[in-house]
């Protein structure tokens, strides 16, 4: 599988190309006198060190690129790697089934949970079917239906956030996009079961918040969370999307900044080079975080859970 190196990773890409070339030569002619294995090992060590150096000093715009990486794991990847017995549930029981949001019942270490998350799609046909991860009102109403079901059966709710934003099409507006988002915000604040939200890629505006009100809010190390995309912000402030890197830095969209502002609880470390380099390791880290969060929330009564969530919401913003 291609790693799809980003622009700032080009020095790493060049080293990896050399490694691939030497490995191919070695396979073609095993009778070569020179010791290719030794050189390949040296280059691999150099690639790891270079990756560490580059990723130790990433800017907000580079993190935004990683959050959108075409090979980055999506909700269904984490469902497959970290959960068991997933049974997908479909439809909002009012209009349609929005494929941009997936949800269903699964087991996390044997415990039944309700999973809800954005799903972008990888190949062209799937991207179109999933609407590039941009939900319509029926997607948010499906999510709310599943949340209410989870509450009835006393199941914790786990959401995965990864969207550029809610779909802004005319049809979505006609069917009540803003109402669907607002209703989810209100109802999520009232749920009597634990709610754990994790930003796994892009956390885009109200489209993200509509499944993002929880008792615990986590972000993967190279994910973003913002009210608008860097390109959108740059287009408004500087009349040019070319200023997106400047906007990304100014907006404070990355996990460390949001944790500093107490908008999120935890940052889940990613494998060296990002989650797409090792989805299995990323899923294991995410699973450990979810289990730790559930253990904390299990100690609270329903009244304590609701009061804590209310206090959390009231603490947002500057005094």
Curated annotation (Swiss-Prot):
Q: Where is the signal peptide?
A: none
In which domain of life is the source organism classified? Bacteria
Q: Which residues form the CoA carboxyltransferase C-terminal domain?
A: 35-296
Cite the entry's keywords alphabetically. ATP-binding, Cytoplasm, Fatty acid biosynthesis, Fatty acid metabolism, Lipid biosynthesis, Lipid metabolism, Nucleotide-binding, Transferase
The UniProt catalytic activity note for this protein reads: N(6)-carboxybiotinyl-L-lysyl-[protein] + acetyl-CoA = N(6)-biotinyl-L-lysyl-[protein] + malonyl-CoA
According to the UniProt entry, its GO molecular function terms are: acetyl-CoA carboxylase activity; ATP binding; carboxyl- or carbamoyltransferase activity
Q: Name one GO biological process term.
A: fatty acid biosynthetic process
**Compartments (UniProt record):** Cytoplasm
Question: Which residues pair up as cystines?
Answer: none
Q: So what EC number does this one have?
A: 2.1.3.15
Record bears the keyword Lipid biosynthesis:
yes
The pathway noted for it is: Lipid metabolism; malonyl-CoA biosynthesis; malonyl-CoA from acetyl-CoA: step 1/1
How does this polypeptide assemble, per the annotation?
Answer: Acetyl-CoA carboxylase is a heterohexamer composed of biotin carboxyl carrier protein (AccB), biotin carboxylase (AccC) and two subunits each of ACCase subunit alpha (AccA) and ACCase subunit beta (AccD).
Q: Which family does it belong to?
A: Belongs to the AccA family.
- Tell me the function of this protein: Component of the acetyl coenzyme A carboxylase (ACC) complex. First, biotin carboxylase catalyzes the carboxylation of biotin on its carrier protein (BCCP) and then the CO(2) group is transferred by the carboxyltransferase to acetyl-CoA to form malonyl-CoA.
* Protein name (Swiss-Prot/TrEMBL): Acetyl-coenzyme A carboxylase carboxyl transferase subunit alpha
From which source organism is this entry?
Klebsiella pneumoniae subsp. pneumoniae (strain ATCC 700721 / MGH 78578)
Q: What is the lineage of its organism?
A: Bacteria, Pseudomonadati, Pseudomonadota, Gammaproteobacteria, Enterobacterales
């Amino acid at each position: 599988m291609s790693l799809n190196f980003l622009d700032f990773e080009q020095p790493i890409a060049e080293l990896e190309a050399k490694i691939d070339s030497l490995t191919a030569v070695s396979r073609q002619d095993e009778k070569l006198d020179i010791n290719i294995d030794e050189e390949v090992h040296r280059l691999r060590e150099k690639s790891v060190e270079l990756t560490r150096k580059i990723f130790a000093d990433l800017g907000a715009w580079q993190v935004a690129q990683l959050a959108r990486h075409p090979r980055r794991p999506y909700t269904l990847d984490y469902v497959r790697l970290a959960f068991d017995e997933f049974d997908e549930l479909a439809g909002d029981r009012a209009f349609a089934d929005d494929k941009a949001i997936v949800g269903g019942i699964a087991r996390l270490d044997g415990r039944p949970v309700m999973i809800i998350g954005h799903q972008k799609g990888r190949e062209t046909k799937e991207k179109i079917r999933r609407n590039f991860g941009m939900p319509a009102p029926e997607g948010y109403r499906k999510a709310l239906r599943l949340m209410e079901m989870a509450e009835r059966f006393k199941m914790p709710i786990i959401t995965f956030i990864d969207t550029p934003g809610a779909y802004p099409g005319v049809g979505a507006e006609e069917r009540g996009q803003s109402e669907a988002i607002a209703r989810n915000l209100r109802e999520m604040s009232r749920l009597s079961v634990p709610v754990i939200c994790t930003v796994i890629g892009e956390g885009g505006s109200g489209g993200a918040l509509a499944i993002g009100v929880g008792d615990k809010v986590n972000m993967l190390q190279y994910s973003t969370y913002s009210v608008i995309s860097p390109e959108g912000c740059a287009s408004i402030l500087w009349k040019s999307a070319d200023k997106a890197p400047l906007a990304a830095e100014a907006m404070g969209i990355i996990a460390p900044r949001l944790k500093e502002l107490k908008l999120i609880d935890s940052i889940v470390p990613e494998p060296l080079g990002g989650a797409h380099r090792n989805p299995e390791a990323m899923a294991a880290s995410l699973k450990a975080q979810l289990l730790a969060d559930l253990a904390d929330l299990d100690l609270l009564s329903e009244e304590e859970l609701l009061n804590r969530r209310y206090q959390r919401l009231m603490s947002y913003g500057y005094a």
